[in-house]
Amino acid sequence: MAKKVSKIVKLQVVAGKANPAPPVGPALGQAGVNIMGFCKEFNERTKDKAGLIIPVEITVFEDRSFTFITKTPPAAVLLKKAAKIEKASGEPNKNKVAKLPRAEAMKIAESKMEDLNAADIEAATRMIEGTARSMGIEIVD
């Protein structure tokens, strides 16, 4: 018989740097999860992506055991890294902070394809381009 799920916790944690301090500790403490067990396992699984923010979905069962799924980093984080900028534009329609080739947007779309709600790579690329536009990053051919 399958275990009963008691809670699903969604967090965004920096890869390889999960620790019991907020936001991880309080979120998992309320669910009754072994916080250090999660931190060690998460850091081990994400050590190759150090520095990126990784969304994680933790499924907590009634016996307080857990499993978790790591997702791809948010599109905004990948776009900022690709454009080599620290911060997006406060006024994306007026101030463009960077230019990014369409091929780079397509690479990001390919890496995020499993997490995007898109039928094909073209639709995924358009989603990434829309995110870039809202951040003040201009997509050029």
Curated annotation (Swiss-Prot):
Pfam families: Ribosomal_L11, Ribosomal_L11_N. The keyword RNA-binding applies. One or more lysine residues are methylated. Keywords: Methylation, Ribonucleoprotein, Ribosomal protein, RNA-binding, rRNA-binding. GO terms for cellular component: cytosolic large ribosomal subunit. NCBIfam families: L11_bact. HAMAP family: Ribosomal_uL11. This is Large ribosomal subunit protein uL11.
